[in-house]
Amino acid sequence: MTKHRNSHNNELSHHLYAVTDKKDNDIVKYGISSDPIDKDGLSGRLRRQLRLFNAVVGWARFIGKILVKGIKGRKKVELMENEYIKAYKKEHGRKPRANRK
């Protein structure tokens, strides 16, 4: 049986990404994915997030960047994502706008 990709037992290679608002140059969200990274440097998950964010505002306001590649295991990448969110909160006094957890 295949392990669910959100399971902490998932040992696939993951990456950590950031979505940035071009309007104020602020990071809106940190995210993680085990989707393959395509030739354009984006994964399917990051691309879907960008499409959604940009569709809501009606223009190409948000950009994405993969920050760290090749992180083995879902649990490890979640811990890394949380550290990035904590560092952002320490610097800005709040979490990125789209990071709810």
Which ranges hold each PLM region?
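Short arginine-rich
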Residues: 83-95
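GIY-YIG nuclease catalytic motif and its immediate N-terminal context
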Residues: 1-80, 100-101
